Design a protein with these regions (language model features):
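Catalytic Walker B motif of ABC-type/P-loop ATPase nucleotide-binding domains
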Residues: 123-126
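Conserved catalytic motifs of ABC-family nucleotide-binding domains
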Residues: 119
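Helix-to-loop junction immediately C-terminal to a conserved catalytic motif
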Residues: 17
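Conserved ABC ATPase "signature" region
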Residues: 65, 69, 76-94
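Conserved ABC transporter NBD signature motif
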Residues: 25-33, 41, 181-183
C-alpha cells in the first residue's frame, strides 16, 4: 500500500489486524470473519504495527521470548527461532539491550522478528523497510520474498517506491482515505513511481529565501 502521510495506510492495517473496528462492513481473512474468529485468525497473523508494540522494559531477546507462548510455542522452540531471527536481522550482538535504549532501526527489526516468530500465514507490515540499514533491508526483502514463495500473504506499507517496484505483485494507492488505484506493476507500462505521482501529484517546492543564506 502506498500513499502520502495521512492517506489512511496505517489505519487500514489496524482495521485489518483487529486493532480498530471498521465503521461499516466486515474484515475477512482466510475466508473467516474477524469479528467471529478473532482468536483463530490472530494465531496465523503477524503484525508489525506503526507503534512497533515492544515491551519497553524488556531486552530484545526477552521481547521475543515473551511472545512465543502466545502463539503456542514452547520455550525451546521460541529460543531456537529467536536465535535464527536475531542472526538474520543482525540483532544478536544487541540482544541483551533493553528496548527503550535501542536505536529506531534495532527497535523496528525486533518488532519484525516478533511478527515473524510463529511463521504466520498472513503478514501485515507497517513500513518494514523504513529506518533500516541497507544490509538488513536486503535481508528483509529476501525473507519476505521467501515467505511469499512459500504461500504467505504479505500486505505492507512503504514510502520507498523503488522497493515496491521490485517486490510487489499488487500495488494499492490510497489518497485522502480512498483507494485510487489497484494494479499489478508487472502488467502495466507505467512504473510504480509514475502511477503514484499521477495520483498524489508531484511536489513543486520553493525553498524560502531565509533557508538559502
Amino acid at each position: 500500500m502506498l500513499g502520502a502521510n495521512g492517506a489512511g495506510k496505517s489505519t487500514l492495517l489496524r482495521v485489518l489486524s483487529g486493532l480498530e473496528e471498521p465503521d461499516s462492513g466486515s474484515v475477512f481473512i482466510g475466508g473467516l470473519a474477524f469479528r467471529d474468529h478473532a482468536v483463530e485468525i490472530r494465531r496465523n497473523l503477524g503484525v508489525l504495527p506503526e507503534a512497533l508494540g515492544l515491551f519497553e522494559s524488556l531486552t530484545i531477546i526477552e521481547n521475543l521470548m515473551a511472545v512465543g507462548p502466545i502463539y503456542g510455542l514452547t520455550k525451546s522452540e521460541t529460543a531456537a527461532r529467536a536465535a535464527d531471527l536475531l542472526g538474520l536481522l543482525d540483532l544478536r550482538q544487541g540482544r541483551h539491550t533493553v528496548a527503550r535504549n535501542c536505536s529506531f532501526g534495532m527497535r523496528k527489526k525486533t518488532a519484525l522478528a516478533m511478527a515473524l516468530l510463529h511463521n504466520p500465514k498472513v503478514l501485515l507490515l507497517d513500513e518494514p523497510f523504513e529506518g533500516i540499514d541497507p544490509a538488513s533491508s536486503a535481508v528483509i526483502e529476501m525473507l519476505l520474498g521467501q515467505l511469499s514463495s512459500d504461500g504467505a500473504t504479505i500486505l505492507l506499507t512503504s514510502h520507498i517506491l523503488s522497493v515496491v517496484q521490485k517486490i510487489a505483485t499488487r500495488v494499492v494507492i490510497l489518497h485522502q482515505g480512498r483507494v485510487e488505484s489497484d494494479f499489478n506493476p508487472s502488467t502495466t507500462d507505467e512504473g510504480v513511481e509514475e502511477v503514484y505521482f499521477s495520483i498524489v501529484g508531484r511536489p513543486q517546492p520553493e525553498v524560502p529565501d531565509w533557508l538559502r543564506s
